[in-house]
Curated annotation (Swiss-Prot):
Species of the source: Dictyostelium discoideum (Social amoeba)
Cross-referenced Pfam families: PK_Tyr_Ser-Thr (PF07714)
SUPFAM superfamilies linked to this entry: Protein kinase-like (PK-like) (SSF56112)
Origin superkingdom: Eukaryota
Main EC class the enzyme belongs to: transferase
Positions annotated as active site in the UniProt record: D192 (proton acceptor)
Domain Protein kinase, first and last residues per copy: 35-328
SMART domains according to UniProt: S_TKc
InterPro entries per the UniProt record, alphabetical: Actin_reg-Ser/Thr_kinase, Kinase-like_dom_sf, Prot_kinase_dom, Protein_kinase_ATP_BS, Ser-Thr/Tyr_kinase_cat_dom, Ser/Thr_kinase_AS
Catalysed reactions, as listed in the record: L-seryl-[protein] + ATP = O-phospho-L-seryl-[protein] + ADP + H(+); L-threonyl-[protein] + ATP = O-phospho-L-threonyl-[protein] + ADP + H(+)
E.C. numbers: 2.7.11.1
Protein name: Probable serine/threonine-protein kinase DDB_G0271402
Lineage: Eukaryota, Amoebozoa, Evosea, Eumycetozoa, Dictyostelia
Length: 765
């Protein structure tokens, strides 16, 4: 007979006395190298959430950064310790805890991966949609024959919603009640129960997650003893006693559960309209009842009203709730076909990485970022009684080795001095930039979730929330969210396509026959005089302008940084034109600006001409060659400047201006009246040869109006023609009172400035 004292007992001793047995103290510690990190699937209050694998098992990895110098370090440490401790509780309706890992200042909490995401994705139909006024308006009109039935869960702004039958909704409520009944049996208060902390697993099994705010209930103080605890949770789901800072117990979870049930029934998010401050944050039944569908089971609605009682003592326990739901389930048939679950993360996973660093698009700093403007060239022509008004444009045309100049450019029909100066010898270097749409590195989620105050650690209720993405954004290929699109132009995608002899304005001289009282009509068509043209891209408007002057040195290439603005080209607005080697460049306030493109360049395959690197090198070589040519032309301009200044001072004198009536020039034109002007016109003939080049001076009029006391030539027209290597210049002014040029300068009405004094010049080869 064996006495009771001799009965063998089990003694759980430490592993020091149990040789050969595995040590379970580090059972939850995970080596970071054993984790495979996938894509980011969510963002909580204290970190990001990634999908991953742990020895072939799909897991969710929550990354939390710990900074000892942070003021929230103490609270964050307590939050992590509490969540890890609560996750050790095991229940089919609780998210399974796998372990913890750390590296550096980051801590990683590993749990099971729940494929369906949070329940709020399937429930809400008015989130980010209704304003409070619209909410109340719909509340009043619910059930009216003239308004649509809001109980129909299939349509929401033309978007199909997941159909949830009432048996399935009751099953969801039952799963949550079972999990909470288990926690309360272990004297644990969740304190943050809400629909975004309920995850949908296989076969629509609900799992409660986010135990960071969990606390132990008062033990030994009787049934439902209250205690003073901090105010935490989500405002719309918190019990009134928690919001008001009163003592509370586990009954606060029952009130939050009742709010979740109301969302399951109405499929609408809880707003301040349901819980006004006038009712001390209790549930407004008058607002709730009109939102309840007509086919809602009455016992289910009664459970909502009981759980949301203002007095905590009048609320049922979760054990009572499970019994009521179980009896209700027996009366309803469970649907055989369940709604499909969404795919929270695509497979396969990426290759293992050392740490879950979020990969972002890295852009080459030498990118052209611009707004495409489809403007066209503008021709500047104005017919006034005083002739062509050029809006005080300072134009000095210096033609170097001029070619293709037709002597028929001057046609005097009906005694009208119609001068057409068609600058058709413009070699416009155009670059056709290939357009590519790149995803902006800007976050593609709804920004309202980033600044939310609900301290949400669920899988999808954050910046990358699939609920927000699919319902409020556009889905593109691969299930990715359509974010802000920025059109970038790679510098390597630019191809040089010079358009030689680009004739922008082909004005026939015969069209300039105007019988307007012998008005001097001057059509100075300089459209397209912008040497560097970028189709679909504006290069000239840059923050680093290129200064080109008489004694300017070699210009530096323009900045490759994105232009701050894109300006439209407006001729005749105090523009100074500089034409170099048949490459006309418009200068506005000493800054290179490009003219708007004539048309958009066609879209083509960006890899058609080789790799991006090779194309970028070709583009750099073209840029260098372009500015080398500009440097050579600038040196030539410096050599010409001195001779030009001397010639202007000697030959362009007021003494050379004299009234003539029938002054026949040596120009070989088909019209015999060439050079003939009326008695009220003044004509000037000047011949100047400098180093084999033809110099064409111009008088600049600073005022478009003619004063009676001063001599103000409103128009001086210059035309050059070639006849047996003899160069002729014909300058015609409008009828005015002739005074010495010095007096005109003194009166500031008509000023001629020598080229050496800083007047911008135009050179054309």
């Amino acid at each position: 007979m064996i006495s009771m004292d001799s009965t063998p007992t089990l003694n759980f001793e430490t592993s020091d006395n149990l040789d050969g047995l595995p040590d379970g103290s580090n059972a939850f510690k995970i080596n970071i190298d054993d984790l495979e990190f996938g894509q980011e699937i969510g963002k909580g209050a204290y970190g990001k959430i990634f999908k991953g694998e742990y020895f072939g098992t799909p897991v969710a990895i929550k990354e939390i950064s710990l900074q000892p110098n942070d003021v929230k370090y103490k609270d964050l440490t307590k939050f992590i310790q509490r969540e890890v401790a609560m996750l050790r509780f095991s229940h089919p309706n609780l998210v399974q805890f796998i372990g913890v890992s750390e590296r550096g200042s980051s801590l990683y909490i590993v749990t099971e991966f729940v494929q369906g995401g949070d329940l709020a994705y399937y429930l809400f139909r008015n989130k980010f949609d209704d304003t409070p006024e619209q909410y109340i308006h719909r509340k009043v009109n619910v059930g009216s024959s003239s308004t649509p039935d809001l109980s129909d869960p299939t349509v929401h702004n033309g978007e199909k919603l997941v159909q949830l039958a009432w048996p399935l909704r009751i099953k969801i409520a039952y799963d949550v009640a079972c999990a909470m009944a288990y926690l309360h049996s272990r004297n644990v208060i969740h304190r943050d129960l809400k629909s975004t902390n309920l995850l949908v697993g296989d076969n629509w099994r609900i799992k409660v997650c986010d135990m960071g705010f969990a606390r132990t209930a008062q033990v030994g103080g009787g049934s439902r003893a209250k205690r003073t605890m901090t105010i935490c949770g989500t405002t719309n789901c918190m019990a009134p006693e928690v919001v008001l800072g009163q003592d509370y117990n586990e009954a606060c979870d029952v009130f939050s559960y009742g709010i979740v049930l109301s969302e399951i029934i109405t499929r609408m998010d809880t707003t301040n309209n349901l819980r006004p401050s006038s009712l001390k944050y209790g549930l407004d039944v008058d607002v709730l009842l009109p939102l309840v569908p007509k086919d809602c089971p009455p016992p289910f609605l009664k459970l909502v009203l009981d759980c949301t009682e203002y007095d905590p003592d009048n609320r049922p326990t979760f054990k009572e709730i499970t019994e009521r739901l179980k009896s209700l389930t027996k009366k309803l048939s469970t649907p055989h076909i369940l709604p499909p679950l969404r795919v929270l993360a695509q497979s396969p996973l990426t290759s293992p990485i050392q740490s879950p660093i979020s990969t972002k698009n890295q852009f080459n700093p030498n990118l052209f970022k611009s707004i495409v403007h489809n403007n066209h060239n503008h021709s500047s022509s104005s017919n006034n009684s005083s002739g062509y008004n050029n809006n005080s444009n300072h134009n000095i045309n210096i033609t170097v080795n001029s070619i293709n100049i037709n002597s028929s450019n001057i046609n005097n029909n009906n005694n009208n001095n119609n001068i057409n100066n068609n600058n058709n010898n413009n070699n416009n270097i155009s670059f056709s930039g290939r357009q590519e749409e790149l995803m902006s590195p800007i976050s593609m989620g709804d920004e309202s979730d980033l600044d939310s105050d609900d301290e949400d650690d669920s899988y999808t209720s954050s910046a990358s929330s699939s609920r927000c993405n699919s319902r409020n954004g556009k889905i593109i290929n691969g299930g990715k969210q359509m974010g802000y699109i920025i059109k970038h132009h790679y510098s390597s995608d630019l191809e040089s396509s010079p358009n030689g002899n680009n004739i922008n304005n082909n004005n026939n001289n015969n069209n300039n026959n105007n019988n307007n009282n012998n008005n001097n009509n001057n059509n100075n068509n300089n459209s397209g005089n912008n040497g560097i043209c970028i189709n679909s891209l504006s290069l000239g408007v840059s923050s680093s302008p290129i200064q080109i002057g008489l004694s300017s040195k070699s210009p530096t290439p323009p900045s490759m940084s994105p232009p701050t603005s894109v300006k439209s080209y407006h001729p005749n607005n105090n523009n100074n034109n500089i034409n170099i080697n048949n490459t006309n460049t418009n200068i506005n306030n000493n800054k290179i600006s490009s003219s708007p493109p004539v048309k958009n360049s066609p879209k083509s395959n960006r890899f058609s001409n080789g790799s991006l690197k090779q194309q970028f090198q070709q583009y750099q070589q073209q840029q260098q060659q372009l500015f080398l040519n500009i440097n050579e032309d600038d040196k030539e301009l410096e050599e010409l400047s001195k001779s030009i200044d001397d010639t202007f001072r000697l030959h362009f004198s007021p003494l050379n201006i004299s009234p003539t009536q029938n002054n026949n020039n040596n120009n070989n034109n088909s019209n015999n009246n060439n050079g003939n002007v009326n008695h009220n016109h003044h004509h000037l003939n000047q011949h100047s040869h400098i180093n084999g080049h033809l110099i064409s001076p111009t008088i600049i009029s600073s005022s478009s109006t003619t004063s009676s006391s001063t001599s103000t030539p409103s128009l001086v027209s210059l035309t050059s023609s070639r006849d047996h290597h003899h160069h002729h210049i014909s300058v015609t002014s409008s009828p005015t009172n002739i005074k010495p040029l010095s007096s005109s300068i003194a009166s500031n009405s008509s000023v001629f400035t020598p080229l050496g004094s800083g007047l911008t010049r135009t050179v054309q080869s």
